[in-house]
Each structure stands twice: as structure tokens, then as C-alpha cells.
Amino acid sequence: MDLEIFDQTTAQLPNEQLEMVRDLLQYAAKELSLSENTEMSLTFVNNPEIKKLNAQYRNVDRATDVLSFAAEEAGDETPIIMDPEMAAEIPVNLGDLFISIDKVAEQAKFLGHSVDRELGFLAVHGFLHLNGYDHEEPADEEKMFKLQREILDGYGLTR
């Protein structure tokens, strides 16, 4: 998977954390059997920036931990007829994730686990949203959260 990571925070994340998130999302992509030509972006921001995005796109005037903007919503697809070999070469853009590093630190402290664990949790949570998972209904929540746990545990990021 082609993963572009941008760090727009005032205190840049350590390379070790950036690499951990990159490796974790690559692991998650393999767990979901995504094709290698899948692409997405992840941008780390501070609370003021994620608050702006949350207000602009969700009409919620407060900072949040993670925002996911899927490139395509389920059912948006218009069928295109093309040669299967050509279709396999066209990149599949999942969309864009934004994670507030301020919220990562706050929530890790509140929940009593490491910053790496919270960072990984939010990255996988947003990644699953980009792949069509949600937690609006109890059955969907159970399915998404089970997969989230399996990915985090399989990667070795336990509580």
C-alpha cells in the first residue's frame, strides 16, 4: 500500500512513531487483503487544526481524535468496463486520515496506556472507516471493533 504521511504538528513526531504507524497500517492492509496499488494519506495535526476540519466538514465545533475522509462512499461507484489487467494497475485511493496528536496524548493518559498504543488504535480505527467499516449499528460496531482488536493484537500493540 502506498501510504503518504504528513506531520503538520508543532512538535514533530519521532521517526520511530512514524515508522510504527506506517508498519501497522501496512500490516492492517495485508490483514484486509488490500491490493498493493491501494493508496491513502495520513496527516498528523494539533487540536486547533482538527477542530477547524471537524467544524468545516462535520459541523462539530470541537477538536476530535481522528477524522477519516473516504475517497468513495459505499454505493458511489459507477461501473467502468475495462480490461482486468488494466484495472489491476489503477491505484485505489482509500482517502485521507487526520489524527490529532494532542488528543492522542490526552487519551493515552486518561486511558492509562502508551502513546504508541493510542496512536496505533486511532490509525487503525480511521483506516477501517476508510475501508467502509462503521459503528453506527451494534452489529457493525461489534464487527469493526473485533477486527480492530485483532489487527492491534496481531501487530503486538496490546493494552
UniProtKB/Swiss-Prot annotation:
- List the GO cellular component terms: cytoplasm
Protein residues bound to Zn(2+):
125, 129, 135
What's a single GO MF annotation on this record?
Answer: metalloendopeptidase activity
Explain how, and how many, cofactor molecules are bound: Binds 1 zinc ion.
Keywords for this protein: Cytoplasm, Endonuclease, Hydrolase, Metal-binding, Nuclease, Ribosome biogenesis, rRNA processing, Zinc
Q: Which Gene3D superfamilies match?
A: Metalloproteases ('zincins'), catalytic domain
Q: Which cofactor is recorded for it?
A: Zn(2+)
Cell compartments where the protein resides:
Cytoplasm
Q: What is its main location?
A: cytoplasm
Q: Could you tell me which InterPro entries the record lists for this protein?
A: MetalPrtase_cat_dom_sf_prd (IPR023091), YbeY (IPR002036), YbeY_CS (IPR020549)
A GO BP term here is: rRNA processing
The broad enzyme category this protein falls into is hydrolase
According to the UniProt entry, what is the EC number of this protein?
Answer: 3.1.-.-
Protein family according to the UniProt entry: Belongs to the endoribonuclease YbeY family.
Recorded hits in HAMAP family, A to Z, give:
Endoribonucl_YbeY (MF_00009)
What NCBIfam families is this protein classified in?
A: rRNA maturation RNase YbeY
What is known about what this protein does?
Single strand-specific metallo-endoribonuclease involved in late-stage 70S ribosome quality control and in maturation of the 3' terminus of the 16S rRNA.
This one is known as Endoribonuclease YbeY
The protein's organism comes out as Limosilactobacillus reuteri (strain DSM 20016) (Lactobacillus reuteri)
